[in-house]
């Protein structure tokens, strides 16, 4: 999501901050006429447009911090003249104009020296990324060998037979070695589709909760909170506790400068990322021990499940939380919301890993004060498998891989598939990935065992301290992601043909609900209607097969 120039403040949102011409008009049309617009997109040549990292519909750059500098080491030795494995070949990779593309730029010279091949890098506006690649493969042109893709495009690409698996290259000693089993279970599941490996590990997205550690530890706040709510102020374990903490801090001076702060901040701009926040929040209201899979559709018949009692209650919770944030956040993209937290103006938020890394950079007002934890749970969930509410002895907490999880895929029409895999595998090596995760500003988030500190993993604290992390902040941050990605209960990841249309339908009706135009129940009922229309337009049987394959079902 960040801008491509490393001289600009880092944010994975920056590349889609601007939309021009026909695309801006298309978005305006979508916002004005959500139901018909969603239907109109289905059945066109591409149902999922380009998106930068976690934010498919555009966002703004973070402005209050500056990136640090940390360069990954060279891994592949230069080949000797006459023995270079891919002499004369050219690998063309399609990338977004974003900081998330910087790692590819960094290894260009190393790749060419190690292989004898040439690396051609094509960068386009993030909104054009998917369309450019899709047009190429749909017409069998083969202009691009690889694409840095969002994980939720994979269903579209596999269904069209537009990308190839790399299973036959993975074990070969001819290529840089990386270990897929070092990727934690949840993000690892996104690398394969239908039992075959397609995406080479790179970025590992998921949402966690951020809180002001200094505020929760303040004795005066602890005393006042207990007097008001009857229990100890602490890290929220449930969304009900999250609400209490947000309500308590709302309207207080959180920075000592006399300015009024807010209990929370969430990016809820219409047509942007609100559906991602809802998905993560809603997971423990729907997913649970007796219902580990049913969230989006019934895999037997592709009937939408989005208007279940659990989904409705979760949206009611989100709508209620809005009152504890700045009203302007209804028009904010992630960058704006992150800025607000980085400036010390909010006590709580939940979002992607970018924020934890950005909090350590120059300009942040909260470095050394940022607590991080897995998202809160709920005391009960509506088990769609049993059609009833279920309650356990402890809060039901669910992990997530919400976001883009950017990774390379190989085009079916690549003329140099082996050289292409060499490039992607080189970027996936432990030596490279360790630096990407530690520096943070490149938008490549942790998700592999060597990213995490003992006892969770094998990382060294010095790697993070050299990248300017506060030690307490980074220990919280990494452990929160380890728990999130290791949780056996996960929000099912939607990655089938038409994903963009489904998410856009949810997004637009969600905006109506948080804006007070319709009730949560009405918003999700309308979403379910759109989901059914989209499925019918694409084809129920084809969607059922794709959905089951995406879940690993036979």
Describe each region flagged by the PLM:
Residues 45-85, 151-210, 277, 373, ...:
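Hinge/lid segment of periplasmic solute-binding proteins
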Residues 241-247, 284-334, 371-380:
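Glycine-centered hinge/linker elements that transmit conformational signals in sensory
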């Amino acid at each position: 999501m960040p801008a491509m120039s490393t001289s600009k403040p880092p944010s994975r949102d920056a590349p889609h901050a601007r939309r021009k011409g026909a695309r801006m008009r298309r978005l305006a049309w979508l916002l004005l006429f959500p139901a018909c617009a969603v239907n109109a997109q289905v059945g066109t040549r591409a149902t999922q447009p380009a998106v930068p990292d976690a934010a498919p519909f555009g966002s703004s750059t973070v402005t209050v911090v500056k990136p640090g500098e940390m360069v990954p080491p060279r891994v592949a030795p230069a080949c000797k003249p006459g023995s270079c494995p891919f002499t004369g070949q050219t690998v063309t990779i399609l990338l977004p104009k974003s900081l998330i593309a910087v790692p590819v730029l960094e290894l260009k010279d190393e790749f060419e020296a190690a292989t004898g091949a040439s690396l051609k890098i094509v960068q386009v506006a993030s909104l054009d990324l998917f369309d450019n690649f899709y047009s190429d493969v749909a017409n069998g042109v083969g202009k691009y060998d690889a694409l840095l893709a969002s994980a939720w495009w994979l269903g579209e690409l596999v269904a069209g037979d537009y990308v190839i698996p790399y299973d036959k290259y993975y074990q070969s000693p001819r290529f840089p070695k990386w270990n897929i089993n070092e990727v934690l279970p949840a993000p690892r599941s996104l690398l394969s589709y239908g039992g075959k490996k397609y995406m080479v590990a790179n970025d590992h997205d998921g949402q966690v909760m951020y809180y002001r550690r200094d505020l929760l530890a303040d004795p005066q706040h602890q005393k006042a909170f207990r007097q008001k709510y009857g229990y100890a102020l602490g890290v929220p374990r449930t969304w009900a506790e999250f609400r209490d903490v947000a309500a308590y801090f709302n309207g207080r001076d959180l920075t000592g400068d006399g300015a009024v702060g807010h209990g929370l901040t969430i990016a809820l701009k219409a047509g942007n990322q609100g559906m991602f926040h809802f998905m993560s929040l809603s997971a423990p209201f729907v997913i649970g021990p007796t219902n580990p899979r049913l969230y989006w559709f019934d895999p037997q018949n592709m009937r939408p499940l989005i208007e279940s009692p659990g989904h409705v209650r979760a949206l009611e919770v989100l709508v209620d939380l809005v009152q504890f944030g700045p009203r302007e956040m209804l028009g904010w993209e992630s960058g704006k919301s992150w800025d607000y937290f980085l400036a010390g103006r909010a006590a709580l938020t939940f979002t992607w890993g970018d924020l934890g890394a950005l909090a350590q950079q120059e300009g942040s007002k909260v470095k050394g004060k940022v607590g991080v934890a897995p998202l809160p749970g709920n005391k009960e969930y509506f088990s769609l498998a049993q059609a009833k509410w279920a309650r356990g002895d402890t809060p039901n907490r669910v992990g997530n891989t919400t976001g883009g999880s950017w990774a390379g895929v190989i085009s079916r029409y690549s003329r140099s598939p082996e050289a292409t895999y060499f490039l992607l595998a080189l970027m996936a090596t432990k030596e490279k990935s360790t630096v990407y995760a530690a520096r943070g500003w490149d938008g490549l988030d942790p998700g592999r065992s060597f990213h995490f500190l003992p006892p969770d993993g094998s990382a060294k604290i010095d790697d993070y301290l050299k990248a300017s992390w506060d030690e307490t902040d980074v220990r919280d941050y990494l452990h929160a992601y380890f728990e999130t990605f290791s949780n056996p209960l996960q929000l099912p990841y939607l990655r089938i043909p038409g994903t963009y249309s489904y998410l856009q339908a949810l997004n637009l009706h969600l905006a109506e609900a948080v804006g007070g135009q319709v009730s949560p129940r009405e918003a999700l009922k309308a979403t379910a209607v759109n989901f059914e229309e989209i499925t019918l337009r694409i084809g129920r049987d084809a969607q059922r097969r794709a959905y089951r394959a995406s879940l690993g079902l036979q």
